[in-house]
């Protein structure tokens, strides 16, 4: 899962002792095999409710997604269980986003996953962090065709478009996609990419003047600059 491991390193330190989150994660994972829906939901809901969401996001939700993905990869849980956990994590992030005020001013940011990419937890996390900082966010989610992305950017004229790449593409597919982004999206918006795949394809992105974000700390720095620029134009 893209950016998830890096997110923990770049996130603010949580106020709870790390062992508390580690113990909770072990308890949550223990409910997945054998699968116990009631205990899983009670523990997850209870934990997220009692800490600030930023701490819950980086101390519980992102590590949980990362570890569940690894369990599925190692054939310790079924893909249906992995999807179940992922949907709960998505719901938590969407719920937190919906409690934030709708920005009428500030930098405009489009967040999406490229064509064929269905894993959107990291992209959703990016959208949340943009919302927290007062950006006007257009979150498009998974598997967005380049033509559709370009069409939207042409209409809303964003200050920045961020794409989430969890995995590197083959050389041919990467070249085709990056050229399409440069030709169709870049004329309407500055482009940035993040994730393990983006970092692996760094040279190709740099060749086409597309910014590669190393982690969430670098994202936050870029967003702060955008918001200052937006304020100065107001």
Can you annotate each of these PLM segments?
Residues 1-101:
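Long amphipathic alpha-helical segments
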Residues 75-234:
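C-terminal regulatory/effector modules of DNA-binding transcriptional regulators
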């Amino acid at each position: 899962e893209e950016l998830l491991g890096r997110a923990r390193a770049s996130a603010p330190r949580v106020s709870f002792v790390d062992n508390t989150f580690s113990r909770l994660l072990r308890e949550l994972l223990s409910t997945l095999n054998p699968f116990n829906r009631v205990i899983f939901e009670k523990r997850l809901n209870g934990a997220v409710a009692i800490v600030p969401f930023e701490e819950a996001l980086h101390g519980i939700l992102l590590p949980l997604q990362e570890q569940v993905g690894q369990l599925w990869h190692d054939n310790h849980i079924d893909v249906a269980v992995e999807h179940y956990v992922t949907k709960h994590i998505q719901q938590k992030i969407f719920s937190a986003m919906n409690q934030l005020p709708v920005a009428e001013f500030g930098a405009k940011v489009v967040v999406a996953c490229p064509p064929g990419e269905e894993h959107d937890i990291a992209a959703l996390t990016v959208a949340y962090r943009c919302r927290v900082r007062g950006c006007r966010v257009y979150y498009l989610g998974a598997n967005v065709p380049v033509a559709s992305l370009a069409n939207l950017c042409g209409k809303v004229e964003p200050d920045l478009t961020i794409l989430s790449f969890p995995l590197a593409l083959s050389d041919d597919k990467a070249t085709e996609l990056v050229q399409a982004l440069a030709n169709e999206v870049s004329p309407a918006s500055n482009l940035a990419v993040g994730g393990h795949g983006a970092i692996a394809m760094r040279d190709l992105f740099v060749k086409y003047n597309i910014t590669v974000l190393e982690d969430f700390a670098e994202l936050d720095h870029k967003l702060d600059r955008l918001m200052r620029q937006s304020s100065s134009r107001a």
